[in-house]
Each structure stands twice: as C-alpha cells, then as structure tokens.
Design a protein with these regions (language model features):
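Accessory interaction regions appended to the cores of large information-processing enzymes
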Residues: 1-323
Length: 323
C-alpha cells in the first residue's frame, strides 16, 4: 500500500524525503441519513451504506478529511480543517445524487492535565476605518483578543486577532454584511490554547412549522413581522422544519399553511394583493452557519432545508431543560 508522504526510491539507495505532515482536524460534523417526511423524493442515493462508502472514499483521496463511525449505524462523524472544507464535500455529494442530513460544525477540543484546550486561529482583517468599531465589537463578543492594529492612513485599517475557531463559524457572512462587502478576512491555525468561555452561537430564534403542507401567501404575510422568512408561497413544509428566523431569542411554532377564511361578507379595502418581502436564497454555507446545536440541514440534489433534530413539537417540549 502507498500512503501520502511515502517515498519511492531505489533499493540500494533508500533515501526517503522528509515526510509530509497534515494539520490535525479542528472541526467535526455529523453526517446521517435523512429521516424527514420528504426523504427519498429528490435524492437517488439515501442508504447509510452508500453514504459510508462515499465518505471512506473521500478519506482515501483527501488527507485532511477523517471519518469515524458512531454508536448509530446511520450517523458518521466527519472531521476536517474547517466548515468550508465540509461544505465543499457536502456540495459534491449532493451533486452526485446523495440525500443526507448534517449537523452544526463543532470544534474538536483537546485535554491536557485536566484542562480543556480549544483550537485558536490568527485572524487578519483589512477594512475601512468606518467599520472598525462594529468589527471589533463583534469579535470581542466572540472571545477574540486584539493582537495588533495598523492604520495605513489611507482610510483602511488592518486588524489582527487571536480568536477561537468556533467563533468563526458563521462569522464570515456576517463580516461581509457589516463591511458592505469591502472587508478582507484571512486566518491561519495558530495552535491550541485554554478554553475562552461560552458565548451564544446565535442571538435569534427559529420559526418552526407545526404541520406538513404547502406554504400560503396569506400565512406568510402575517408571519413576516415575526422575523425573516426562508420560504415562498407554494414551497412544501413539514412539522419541525425551520422556515424563518425569529426576531427574538426563543423559537416559535407557526402554521405557514393557514389560508384566509372565506365568507359572504365583502368589506372595502380587504381584497388587496398580498405583497411579500423578497426571500434571500438559503445556500449550503449559510445554512451550515445558521443552525444551532438542536438543528440540522437537510441536503438533497434540489433543495436545502433547515429542520429541528427532533421534528415533533411534543418531543422537543419533553426534551427542553427544566428549571
């Protein structure tokens, strides 16, 4: 067998080259079969055995990817160097016809002398001076520590931070929004350091469908004041599917299929067309960054849906933490 880093040489001159080393993975995600009500509708490869074979094949040709089997035969733990590397693998699999469910990226901790250590990234940022305040504020809230600041005198500033790798999950899109697309962000792996403390993965809740059906414009119009919606009229939904971002920190169950009641009464000004706000398409990267620990992304060749890990509202109620 030949492995990455091996040297092929003559028998009488066995002089191996310096072996190549690959950085240890810092992020892990759970890949599993889809158990949603729409399972098998859009994907042609849904079996756990096929998903396992595909992941093993990926580890053989991509040395930065590792795969471990879990206590469940339908769930696989995939490790890599970052959430974008994971997103590339998932996107490749969906284009090959796979249908699967993935969880939120989780950092891989190490323990030394009983102390928990976490991966730390060195973060380089180049942005306009006008955005320095909001960038610094948000990175500080994510346990980032400023290491250096250089003002070029040209209206742009360079910032350097050391920050936990988990804090960068979902931050890149937010950074581009805060800097109006003009900011530049780069990172490199610095090493492991002491755990810097907890912080919320997201400051908003989810709007969760309480039934299966098709979304109706009337229902979505009435739900718009509650937050940003991810679906349009006519899109299929099911119980436990996340179809919007709640303005507040808590989750709410809602009915996106509710139709307007018809009656013989006709009132002036009640028949206007319903006008909905534009829906921002849910990309794979955005979905992976958006979900929380109790949520998952359902990936098919045609759709990307957000859902709760426990679809039943009663099941989620029973599992909620008790005070």
């Amino acid at each position: 067998d030949v492995h990455i880093g091996n040297t092929s040489c003559l028998k009488d001159q066995p002089l191996p080259l310096t072996r190549l080393t690959v950085d240890d993975p810092t992020v892990a995600m759970r890949f599993s079969i889809s158990n949603s009500p729409f399972s098998g509708r859009e994907g042609k490869i849904v079996q756990s055995s096929k998903i396992r074979e595909r992941l093993i094949k990926e580890t053989l040709r991509n040395v930065a990817i590792q795969m471990e089997e879990t206590e469940s035969r339908d769930v696989f733990l995939v490790k890599g160097r970052g959430e974008f590397q994971m997103a590339i693998l998932i996107e490749t699999m969906r284009r090959e016809g796979f249908e699967l469910t993935v969880g939120r990226p989780e950092v891989i901790y190490k323990y030394k002398d009983g102390e928990r250590l976490e991966p730390i990234e060195h973060l380089y940022i180049d942005c306009d001076e006008a955005f320095m305040g909001i960038v610094t504020e948000k990175l500080s809230a994510r346990k980032g520590q400023m290491a250096n600041m250089i003002n070029h005198g040209s209206g742009r500033v360079r910032l350097e931070f050391t920050i936990p790798a988990r804090a960068l999950i979902g931050y890149r899109d937010e950074f581009l929004t805060d800097t109006k697309g003009t900011g530049i962000l780069n990172t490199y792996f610095e090493g492991y350091d002491s755990y810097r403390g907890d912080f919320p993965s997201r400051f908003t809740g989810s709007i969760v469908s309480d039934r299966q059906g098709q979304a109706v414009a009337y229902a979505l119009f009435n739900l718009e004041p509650r937050g940003q919606l991810f679906i349009e009229p006519g899109d299929p939904v099911y119980e436990g599917m996340v179809f919007g971002e709640h303005n507040r920190a808590n989750d709410i169950n809602a009915n996106p299929c509710k139709e307007m009641k018809h009656s013989n009464m006709r009132a002036s000004g009640r028949d206007e067309n319903v006008i909905l706000s534009p829906v921002k398409p849910m990309t794979l990267e955005r979905a992976i960054h958006f979900i929380r620990e109790d949520e998952m992304v359902e990936v098919t060749p045609r759709s990307i849906r957000l859902r709760k890990a426990v679809l039943s509202a009663q099941g989620r109620y029973r599992q909620r933490p008790r005070d």
